[in-house]
């Protein structure tokens, strides 16, 4: 299961930029990886753990802008096609069941 966070936040004022930085930092601290600008994804073991993570992110959401979440299965995530560009080869973004470090 993957939890995807997509957001579009205002950056017109210094307060807006501060809110943006805090939200982005909170996502990274929770283990999310950036797959595109303003699109972050995290692996969750179950739908219940993804819902829990969604609740945690809701506590740090900025007061303005748009923040959306999407839960997708591993198969759905792996069926994503790249029309332009290539996939980031990050071990944390791997679909492998076992990762040897």
UniProtKB/Swiss-Prot annotation:
SUPFAM superfamilies: TTP0101/SSO1404-like. Belongs to the CRISPR-associated endoribonuclease Cas2 protein family. Homodimer, forms a heterotetramer with a Cas1 homodimer. GO terms for molecular function: metal ion binding; RNA endonuclease activity. CRISPR (clustered regularly interspaced short palindromic repeat), is an adaptive immune system that provides protection against mobile genetic elements (viruses, transposable elements and conjugative plasmids). CRISPR clusters contain sequences complementary to antecedent mobile elements and target invading nucleic acids. CRISPR clusters are transcribed and processed into CRISPR RNA (crRNA). Functions as a ssRNA-specific endoribonuclease. Involved in the integration of spacer DNA into the CRISPR cassette. InterPro entries: CRISPR_associated_Cas2, Virulence_VapD/CRISPR_Cas2. This is CRISPR-associated endoribonuclease Cas2. Its cofactor is Mg(2+). Keywords: Antiviral defense, Endonuclease, Hydrolase, Magnesium, Metal-binding, Nuclease. Coiled coil: none annotated. Mg(2+) binds at residue 8. It comes from the Bacteria. It comes from Lacticaseibacillus rhamnosus (strain ATCC 53103 / LMG 18243 / GG) (Lactobacillus rhamnosus). One of its GO terms (biological process) is maintenance of CRISPR repeat elements. Its EC number is 3.1.-.-. It is an enzyme of class 3 (hydrolase).
């Amino acid at each position: 299961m993957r939890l995807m966070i997509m957001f579009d936040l205002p950056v017109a004022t210094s307060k807006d930029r501060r809110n943006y930085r805090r939200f982005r930092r909170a996502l990274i601290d929770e283990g999310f990886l950036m797959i595109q600008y303003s699109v972050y994804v995290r692996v969750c073991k179950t739908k219940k753990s993804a819902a829990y993570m969604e609740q945690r992110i809701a506590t740090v959401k900025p007061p303005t802008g748009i923040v959306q979440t999407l839960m997708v299965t591993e198969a759905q995530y792996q069926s994503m096609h790249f029309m332009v560009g290539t996939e980031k080869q990050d071990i944390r973004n791997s679909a492998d069941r076992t990762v040897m470090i």
